[in-house]
């Protein structure tokens, strides 16, 4: 349109103060463009007569008139300072780069569009041809005619924008990003796409949506490692793994069940464990061997057994069944010489010992007598527990070696080894006729019971406990203690739920038979260390 004006006059007056120009003082590049791009010469000027900024001072007529043609102004735009690197010269590298980028964008856009041909006779075709001719005539000589020119205002704004942005915000936007941001009508919209940077340099990531069909990776757990060896060494009674030297874990030679020496009933002796060829069977294995009936009826010749196999079989049988086999063989073959020449003498000695033992059982015994008798009876019971088929009137010889290994301590030895703090304090206070200080009590206990290693704090708690029970008297200052010799054994306790019968003889308290063999009439309740214990009297 050669006759169209560059600015259409709207007929109104122009006011510089109220002009809504977007590049005002808040623009980020105040050094390249003047804050006020347009200013009116007089109050009666309209928008068709304006002054251009310093970048466009090369135009001959600074006032763009509506009657002037646009191409005449562009012809003289680049003439002054043609060879210099001024802002208005096309020799400037930034301007050349901007024109080259616009050319590439125009070429890519044309290649993506479908081919379109217009009829030469149509009016639209003629109109576009005239507009293109005017645009080509307005291009500078060093710009190709095939390129699509940009208006001078757009070129200036793009150059100023790129120069004014800081280096941290000047993010290179490639063709892909421009294609994502641009729209068909030329406007730029900002989308929150994954992996796309905004103009300020911030990365925008799209939130991940929950998909119930997607299986999340799970951590695979390996096979559990259990200490099989350690569990196999656990005592079957107390369920502990510790095996101290004085209470070792022993495995049964029959069922391979582990037991502590003190946990198994009866106690497992150290001599049996120290012997290289010793075998030990638990009580369950011995009971099963007892209950198994003895089956006979076949000879070793028929089974073709060797001497070692015969010995192994006979050792597996309990003693009672072996005695029965010997008696049965004697009945079949009385001429077998398996008796000792001193058999009658041995039997008489055993009978005399047994009669003496049964005579003393009906007499009242003291602590020492009970110890000696208990030593003999326990040894006899251990050596004859499997000989149930023997006559009851024939005593069995006592194993002297077993008696020495199972020696029962005396009362003093027992107090030093197994008594608690309350018993020790009572014994010490009983040895003093008058009240003594706390230091005297502790020194006496440390000297007499040095192997126990009793702490002073335990002695203090024991004294306080005995004072509450009225067994020990303490003075008003709390510095001396004395045994309460007037303690009434028949007086009931202060606590209504427990009755105290007082101290009982030490022989009865330490060495008593099993309570399940006695009735309730022969038992008495004794509170020791604030715990009721049922003790039986003889």
Swiss-Prot record:
Q: Taking the first listed entry, what is the main subcellular location of this protein, grouped into a coarse class? A: nucleus
In this chain, composition skew of type Polar residues spans 367-392
Give me the Gene Ontology terms describing cellular component.
chromatin; Lsd1/2 complex; mating-type region heterochromatin; nucleus; pericentric heterochromatin; subtelomeric heterochromatin
Alphabetized UniProt keyword annotations: Chromatin regulator, Metal-binding, Nucleus, Transcription, Transcription regulation, Zinc, Zinc-finger
Biased composition of type Basic and acidic residues is found at: 98-111
Q: Where are the zinc fingers (PHD-type)?
A: 232-288
Gene Ontology biological-process annotations: chromatin remodeling; heterochromatin boundary formation; negative regulation of gene expression, epigenetic; positive regulation of DNA-templated transcription
- By its UniProt entry, which SUPFAM superfamilies does this protein fall under? FYVE/PHD zinc finger
Q: Where is this region: Disordered?
A: 28-47, 98-150, 198-222, 367-396
Q: Where in the cell is it found?
A: Nucleus
Entry superkingdom: Eukaryota
For this UniProt entry, the molecular function terms from Gene Ontology, in alphabetical order, are: chromatin binding; DNA binding; zinc ion binding
State whether keyword Manganese applies.
no
Q: What InterPro entries has UniProt attached to this entry?
A: Zinc_finger_PHD-type_CS, Znf_FYVE_PHD, Znf_PHD, Znf_PHD-finger, Znf_RING/FYVE/PHD
What quaternary arrangement does the UniProt entry report? Component of the SWM histone demethylase complex composed of at least lsd1, lsd2, phf1 and phf2.
Functional note: Component of the SWM histone demethylase complex that specifically demethylates H3K9me2, a specific tag for epigenetic transcriptional activation, thereby acting as a corepressor. Has a role in regulating heterochromatin propagation and euchromatic transcription.
Could you tell me what this protein is called? SWM histone demethylase complex subunit phf2
